[in-house]
Amino acid sequence: MKRSHQETSVEEEAPSMVEKLENGCGGGGDDNMDEFLAVLGYKVRSSDMADVAQKLEQLEMVLSNDIASSSNAFNDTVHYNPSDLSGWAQSMLSDLNYYPDLDPNRICDLRPITDDDECCSSNSNSNKRIRLGPWCDSVTSESTRSVVLIEETGVRLVQALVACAEAVQLENLSLADALVKRVGLLAASQAGAMGKVATYFAEALARRIYRIHPSAAAIDPSFEEILQMNFYDSCPYLKFAHFTANQAILEAVTTSRVVHVIDLGLNQGMQWPALMQALALRPGGPPSFRLTGVGNPSNREGIQELGWKLAQLAQAIGVEFKFNGLTTERLSDLEPDMFETRTESETLVVNSVFELHPVLSQPGSIEKLLATVKAVKPGLVTVVEQEANHNGDVFLDRFNEALHYYSSLFDSLEDGVVIPSQDRVMSEVYLGRQILNLVATEGSDRIERHETLAQWRKRMGSAGFDPVNLGSDAFKQASLLLALSGGGDGYRVEENDGSLMLAWQTKPLIAASAWKLAAELRR
């Protein structure tokens, strides 16, 4: 099943949100309208701001005073969409006599933003999770009473986010400053996954506007490990990545007596116990297993400790095991002679899970790294990457793509696997740090440069690699793993021209592929 990825687009003749702001939001008769409220759909003259604020304050007092004792709905006057805030507030103050009972936690469901959604669309209220006004419960199918319809907070939130990002791209920082404050207020009132992801995007925009960037030296590697462990436990994305890569490795070494794996990102080594146990059960006895783990120099002691723990496991399950830890600041600094490969006597595998996209931050580095991989002549290369295009030149395009992508990720955390709230929060922080890097930084500091499977296919092909079909068995077993891990109905495994993808609802989020040297290079 091959997915057709379709980007959200805006007709060329349609003015941008920032242009609407700068032109008074569209038109004659709206002169002197407050531009920051206008982008959110409210028509308020600058001269009326004080009067509107007073009316809204009075309305809030009336609602607060009446909520404890009222049980009826509004009278028979219809209150229309409150785009005219002044008239709406006055009408409410005049006609509001009673206040319906309300469960303050009442919310409706919010779909994740998908590629087919127009971010500014106002269609279909049924699937948006928004915290509704106190009058919400007065709406029934048979009721003839008047109701008040509040504009969807979620739609306004996305509009404000995109408008702010566009203002940033146009370097209109005064407008961006005002909009990012509005985004923060809207995000605070938005329930569920959308409110959470918007809060991280608002912080990232604010950091970009005010040029407040976290120092790379200030990031504690041990804290990063904790976040990644929680992400691994909380959702199936890393489990899927490790499982599909391991399955490809097992199929490539069925008759090998010596297996050597070079892991370009050892991290906590969570991938390798499962592979070692599978090798131990291989018919005819396990092969000798060599693991070369690459990590950051700041974690040199942790790498050696991990090697010791894996050696203990290997001894317990009867697998001959050797470990070699390598440290480097940049993967592009690796050289072929560092790996001590033995081409004649071993099957060599190079493994990369979410490690290639950061290399794109340095021009020419990915080409050098892939040339090094090619030089060691691996029998197999496994690659798992995020299925997203976050490495384009245009900031607004990257922002829109990231908003869609992380909305789906946050939604899967909210509605997918049932997990403790603390683990979910840590996973959200893990993803939030990616959002901050993607939106707030530029140049070599921006390492979250995710690319799609189609883009990686071009890069791997240019570097001299041919694709390896992961096969129907890997598809079936990955689907089974997903079911056994309690992944929820929203997750699904998709096959894409021999590669596998893990999707939430209809949006692929993770892509796993396997590669071998082109035929002319395998001699």
UniProtKB/Swiss-Prot annotation:
The similarity comment for this entry is: Belongs to the GRAS family. DELLA subfamily.
Locus of motif VHIID: 259-263
The name of this protein is: DELLA protein RGL3
Chain intervals for the UniProt region annotation (Leucine repeat II (LRII)): 305-337
Where does the record place the region PFYRE? Answer: 348-437
Membrane-spanning parts: none
Tissue range of expression?
Expressed at very low level. Mainly expressed in germinating seeds and flowers and siliques. Not expressed in other tissues.
Alphabetized Pfam families for the sequence:
DELLA, GRAS
Q: Which InterPro entries match?
A: DELLA_N_sf, TF_DELLA_N, TF_GRAS
The GRAS domain sits at 148-516
| UniProt keyword list | Developmental protein, Gibberellin signaling pathway, Nucleus, Phosphoprotein, Repressor, Transcription, Transcription regulation, Ubl conjugation
Q: Where is this motif: VHYNP motif?
A: 78-82
Q: Where is this motif: LEXLE motif?
A: 56-60
Subcellular location, record wording: Nucleus
UniProt motif (LXXLL motif) ranges:
356-360
Annotated region Disordered: the residues are: 1-28
Q: How does it assemble?
A: Interacts directly with the GID2/SLY1 component of the SCF(GID2) complex, suggesting that it may be ubiquitinated. Interacts (via N-terminus) with GID1A, GID1B and GID1B (via N-terminus). Interacts with the BOI proteins BOI, BRG1, BRG2 and BRG3.
| Record-level GO cellular component terms | nucleus
User: What processing steps or modifications follow its translation?
Assistant: Phosphorylated.
Role, per record: Probable transcriptional regulator that acts as a repressor of the gibberellin (GA) signaling pathway. No effect of the BOI proteins on its stability. Probably acts by participating in large multiprotein complexes that repress transcription of GA-inducible genes. Its activity may be regulated by phytohormones such as auxin and ethylene.
Q: Which residues does the annotated region (SAW) include?
A: 440-516
Q: Which GO terms describe its biological process?
A: gibberellic acid mediated signaling pathway; response to gibberellin
PROSITE patterns in the cross-refs: GRAS
Organism the protein comes from: Arabidopsis thaliana (Mouse-ear cress)
Annotated region (VHIID), positions in chain: 228-293
Listed GO molecular functions? DNA-binding transcription factor activity
